[in-house]
Amino acid sequence: MKKSLIALTTALSFGLAAAQTAAPVSAPQVPALTDVPAGHWAKDAIDRLVSRGVILGYPDGTFRGTQNLTRYEAAIIIARLLDQMRDGETPAGMTAEDMTALQNAIQELAADLAALGVRVSDLEANAVSKDDFARLEARIEEVAAAGGEQGATEALQGQIDDLTARVDEYDALRADVDDNASSIAALNDLTVLLNQDILDLQDRVSAVEAAQADFVQRSDFDALGGRVTTVETRVETVNNSLTGRIAALERNAFSVKPSLTIGYSVSRTSRNFDVDRLFPLNADGTVANNAFTSGGIDTDTGAQRRDFGDFGNASDPVVAGAAGLYGFADGVSYTVYFTDGSTATFDGLNPADYKVPTGKVIDTTKGRNGFGFNNLARYKEGSTDIGISLGFDTSGQFSQVTSGTGGSLFSTAGRLQVNQIDLNFGLVTGLPSDAYVDTNGNGKKDDGEATGRGTYLGSGGTAAILRDPAGNVYRPVFFRFKNATTQFSVGNNPVIVTLGQQQKFYFSDYVFDNNYDGRGDGFTVTVDGSNVPVIGAWKPQIKGVYGSRSGLDGTAEAGYGVYYRGVRAQITPVGTLTAGIHYAQEGRDMFGAAQNTTSTPSDVTTYGADLHGKAFGVELHSEYATSRVRPNTANAAVQTSNAFYARVATRKDNLAFDLNTPAAKFGNDTFGVSLYDLNYRKIDAGYNNVAGISEYGYGSYSRTSAQNIAYNPDTGVTAPFANLDRQAYTDANNDGTSDRNADGTVVATNTKIGQMGFGVKAAANLGPVAIGGYYDTSTGANGDNANRMTEAGGSAKVAYSIFSLRGTYNTLDSNRPQIYRDAAGTQIIGDAKVRRYAVQADVTPGLGLFVGAYYRDVNVNGVRSTTDRGLLGRGYLASSFEPGVGNNAYRTGLRCADNNFGTGTRDIDGVGGVLNPAVNLDQSRTATCFTSYGVEAGHAGDNANALVKDLFFRVGYSRVYVPTTATATTGDFSGSVTYGDARYDRKVGVANVRLAGSFSTTNTQLDSRPAGTRGAVGLIVRTDPLENVPFRPQFNGQVGYYTADNRVAAGNYNANATKYGAGVVLNDFLLPQTKIGVRYDGYMAQNRQYTPFDGDGTQGYFSDANNNRRTNLNGVYVEGAYQDLIFSYGTYTLSQKDLNGVEYGSGINNGQPARGQTFKISYKVNF
């Protein structure tokens, strides 16, 4: 009931309360109820009850008239009412008979009301509809069938509670009223109210009785609840069991990857040649792959796929010069027969060029006049390759397992917590084409080591096949093991154990740097003590390494007992600055020496310390290492050497030093100083890879640039400073001049001299003015002035509005002999002194546009020179400011290439670089510094407000200093060059378009480029799949043209080349998951050649050559695929003729062009 109704009823029971014959002695304090609105229909009754003290309200002064009245509250109100009635506060005019009748009537009404309440409660308590029951039963069956879920029972219990929790909304009205209850008028009002409640209850009873046929009994529902409980119990049991079993499987799961590879191929050619160079280049400039490619990409050697022939069963390298059709095919080879019965091999095109060794006579009765032509044809007829492999890889799946028990003297607990195990091994039939026999066990392919496929019969590379009489083919099954890694915890501190072949590890730059190829079989243990109390805040770490090499360790001892071992400890005391100490050793032990009694035990021992990281806003790197090498030769002296450097400089994640980013800054960007480099170093001459127990040595990365630097990403060397070479020419005939190779280059020898030096580079911003400078001096480790090289320079820049003015001065003085070319182009060796100054004014009006004017002057050995002969680039600190306003970066490099000079003569796409997506054309600009002046203008497409987004171009005109004669000390600016280049990369609709071009014309030789006019233009288009076109075709094409009119003393000649190609791929061809593609490519060139990689990291390249040859290489490539079943076919032709049209295949394939065809079907099933 609502409190308003009770209040009104109680007030009516007071009827004539105002007619009391006596008033209280003192009026009680009447509380004010704050939530009874004025004008409410019950307000007067509420106020009367409050004034009588029957209702006092809640402690917060509220009445809460809309809130249900509890039995406790009703009891208090009735008790107060009875107390007042007992005290004589009764209505006037009521007789005893009236009071008795009123009491009886109230009792009757109360009894009827109670009876109705009981009936309603019974019906509601058992009121579960059949529909509800059916739905619940269906859900029970679903839960049981699906294995159950905990949420299902909770949902059922909620519905049960909802159906059975219909409590009585009305309390039984009890009115145990004494004889002096109230007046007849109040009783009448109370009766009306009670009658209304009775009518409401009767309506509810009727509704419930009418729907009783749809209800089920409580007993049925209880039975249903029992079934729910049973299902829940079974589901919980099953879930617990499955959870444990699944967790165990996941912890111990191997990823098993069986595969079956089937291939059938036919390949034949009259002479092996390369076709990879026809295909479009990848985005990074590497040669695109195809089904017939051979060879691979190797940054150590510079090898690319275009360096190897692609036909037959052999990966023949292409050969430079006439014997290899100038780098387009493998070489011609002859067997030379001598009268004494011996033979020799001659690699050349014309037997007449062969020079007979002294004392030998050619036997003209054999072969063709003493020469036997070695057949260059390559055949691979109907070869079927079937490979089966089974790989096992945990990929970290072993987790949270425990070790087993063990021990011989005692039994271990077997409770070591293993966090992770990685295993990678497998079984395979046949061998990969690049497998080799690692004879010396150093983990690298060395010259003279046989290929694995050529050694093991039936492994895929030999013609012989093992069969039994039933016709079964037998192939060897090889076990492949890559690594095993275990990670486990000791206490709260993780321990990582790595076990495997060719272990890779790194202690420091000059000690135990074996993170590239690896050192040998063994294991490493790393302990992280970050959770150790007290010292854990310093992040202590300990690493231990142990293994064996089974081969050379650099101390001339091969074969037995060569082991390496080392330990390193490291902490991080402040910021990110780490401090480490280490000890390492490698050598042959006594047992190994016993296998070779002529040798004595030897060892290499090195130890040191290092600091790396940043603290207090300064980045610091420093290392010290000392090494003792005891050779294996008896009585040989122990060699001791040291390496040390301390450097404030920024280091990148790949451990290369970034001298363009300040290592420390003082002040702000407007007024401040930036320190880019500050270093001291001393590397002893004897400190090499043997002394450091490292994979590779610490020699200069390049002989002609950055001589002080050892860092080499091609070999993984991270050491910053080199063990320098002193170059000296040889003089075999004692004529006082250097010996020379056939091409005129100097024959030189190198002697290690170590390095000791100091360097600094800094810059400052002073509002609109920026200044910077650098200085470095280095000698051999002994400090001798004969090997000193010093580089120094300063720069300044003033910028305001859209104008900027830059000036720089650079010097390089080298007493250390340098190999370079003099003004006549002859290679010389000796000391060198270079001076250069430059000034440039730039205007950047916005929209990405720029225009500038410059003057530059270069002096070599005291004489003004056309170029710096490439000498300034042999230092490592030379720097200059960026052009434009708002960019005061003091960047390494003299920016000599900014104004050099259009199209180059070397490229890797065959047409001047315009079809190489990795070339931004400025790559064609030489880094040589010239004596010149000129103007240049252009547009930067990456500018935020660029006039044309993604369009880059520049044009320029320059006058170049030319000496009067090659040896003259005077000259003038009679040389001239006009140049330009452009590049536009843009997505146009569904097509990705790249348009590039360059040109230059000069009347004088510029470094390696002769006088003349050259230019190149290229277009590459690749479309997305055309979704609304049948077969969803995808088109791609390229065309590039290069031309050069070279004016040289030996005679002018024109070189030109055209490269073209077009293809289409049908992505949905007839059947789902079926694709087919076809492309045609060609390359035509005149007076162009290809020089293969040099083996020292330099890639092969195309260049101009006055060889009077016309080369034509073209062919068709078709590839189709259904799912993973791939069909490939190619047919290609290589022709090289002289300018009169005579084929240079004379004596080879009867003077006809070389032709090659290949067909391949391959299918790989991954089970």
UniProtKB/Swiss-Prot annotation:
Residues 29-92 form the SLH domain. Residues 269-377, 429-471, 501-519, 550-561, 589-601, 631-638, 683-753, 780-788, 815-831, 861-931, 961-976, 1003-1014, 1047-1052, 1087-1108, 1139-1153 are extracellular. It is a multi-pass membrane protein. One of its GO terms (cellular component) is cell outer membrane. One of its GO terms (biological process) is monoatomic ion transport. It comes from the Bacteria. Residues 1-22 form the signal peptide. Gene3D superfamilies: 1.10.287.1490. Deinoxanthin binds at S622. Cu(2+) 2 binds at E381, R549, G551, D553, G559. Cu(2+) 1 binds at D274, D276, R305, F308, D310. Keywords: Cell outer membrane, Copper, Ion transport, Iron, Lipid-binding, Membrane, Porin, Signal, Transmembrane, Transmembrane beta strand, Transport. It is found in: Cell envelope; Cell outer membrane. Disruption phenotype: Deletion causes substantial alterations in cell envelope structure, and a significant defect in resistance to solvent and shear stresses. Mutants shed exterior layers of the cellular envelope. Deletion mutants show a significant decrease of the UV resistance, especially under desiccation conditions. Deletions mutants show large disruptions in the OM, but the S-layer is unchanged compared to wild-type cells. Its main location: other. Plays an important role in the structural organization and integrity of the cell envelope, bridging the outer membrane to the peptidoglyan layer. Is a highly abundant molecule in the D.radiodurans cell envelope but is not a fundamental component of the S-layer. Binds the carotenoid deinoxanthin, a strong protective antioxidant specific of this bacterium, and could be part of the first lane of defense against UV radiation, especially under desiccation. Appears to be a nonselective channel. The structure is characterized by a pore region with a massive beta-barrel organization which is embedded in the outer membrane and shows some protrusions into the S-layer, a stalk region consisting of a trimeric coiled coil, and a collar region at the base of the stalk. This is Outer membrane protein SlpA. It comes from Deinococcus radiodurans (strain ATCC 13939 / DSM 20539 / JCM 16871 / CCUG 27074 / LMG 4051 / NBRC 15346 / NCIMB 9279 / VKM B-1422 / R1).
